[in-house]
Amino acid sequence: MPSTWQPIFAGQEAARATAAIDAIAGALAEWPSFPEDDPFGASLATGEAGLALFFSYLDRARPGARYADLAAERLERAIDRVAASFHRPGLYQGFVSIAWTVEHLRDRQDEDDPNEEIDRALFELLARTPWYDGHDLTSGLAGLGAYALERWPGATASACLARVCQRLEELAVPQEVGLAWPTAEWNLYPEERQRFPHGMINLGVAHGVPGVLPVLAQAAAVGAAPESARALLRGAVAWLLSRKLPAGGES
């Protein structure tokens, strides 16, 4: 199928954007290795895995400019440090962040599967109930589901997706309209905890209900979710739509 993608910018705007990309790429190419004692130094959000992803996509846009080598170097450093991240699973800064990056960038034709152990560990972790590590995309269930979707249709990945949906169902709280996933007070930053001492329901993608919806929807679409996940999705969408501000309203 031919691509329908079109550049966002043209002319002078495109030239300015290209110059900005060049400046960013140049700075990141000289970025030193993250310190060994940095707990997030291997991660997708703030570490080696994120730089590997950046340089890999830059190589696709500009092949032959040594970005592939930079991506490989950064990814190797991230993999070497995955054990240090094993005490936290999250998609942004835990061991799943490194595993997702490896899966996203690797050659699927390669018979060696570097993430089998990660899948097994995640499957065991997701058996835990009640679940205390939150629902969100950055460090909770939605992020683990995003990793499992990247690994789909692997058998263990499908089983992980089913467990993600089960844990989300257990955490869902009925609302006046639909249902939602509150963020407990112990999962809030200190300044947020002062404002919301009993927790809150977040409307952002990273930490809130919107980040859960595409994971549930895609899990249902690929047939990896229990039937109850569809009702869960409908309830969450209904709640989210009920939060829409009136015309001219301020958030």
Locations of regions flagged by a protein language model:
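Glycan-recognition and catalytic cores of secretory/periplasmic carbohydrate-active enzymes
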Residues: M1-S251
